[in-house]
């Protein structure tokens, strides 16, 4: 299992209060394959740097989770098939080791 961070930009026409419940449908892929969801952080409606699908705003959400690489790939595939998801990005955060001097 590896740690991942997922950032999702959701269509602004979706109501903000339903964002977490609609994301949960996709995040079930992680838990059914044995992964864990550490944190779901809904940033809310933000202005985009450039228009995506003729929209200048989007609802941002960041999810930290642990899963197998195949599970992360499947999650990205399922998110890309949904029309309300404007953009996704899954990254593996670097190990941040602090060296004491």
From Swiss-Prot:
SUPFAM superfamilies noted in UniProt: Ribosomal protein S6
Molecular function via GO: small ribosomal subunit rRNA binding; structural constituent of ribosome
Highest taxon of the lineage: Bacteria
Keywords, alphabetical: Ribonucleoprotein, Ribosomal protein, RNA-binding, rRNA-binding
GO CC annotation: cytoplasm; ribonucleoprotein complex; ribosome
Transmembrane intervals: none
Protein role: Binds together with bS18 to 16S ribosomal RNA.
Family: Belongs to the bacterial ribosomal protein bS6 family.
NCBIfam families the record matches: S6
Protein's UniProt name: Small ribosomal subunit protein bS6
Organism annotation: Paenarthrobacter aurescens (strain TC1)
């Amino acid at each position: 299992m590896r740690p991942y961070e997922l950032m999702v930009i959701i269509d602004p026409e979706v109501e903000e209060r339903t964002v977490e419940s609609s994301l949960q449908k996709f995040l079930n892929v992680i838990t059914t394959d044995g992964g864990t969801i550490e944190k779901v952080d809904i940033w809310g409606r933000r202005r985009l740097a450039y228009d995506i699908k003729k929209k200048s705003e989007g609802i941002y959400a960041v999810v930290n989770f642990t899963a197998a690489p195949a599970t992360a790939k499947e999650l990205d595939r399922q998110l890309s098939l949904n029309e309300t998801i404007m953009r996704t990005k899954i990254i593996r955060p670097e190990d941040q080791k602090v060296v004491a001097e």
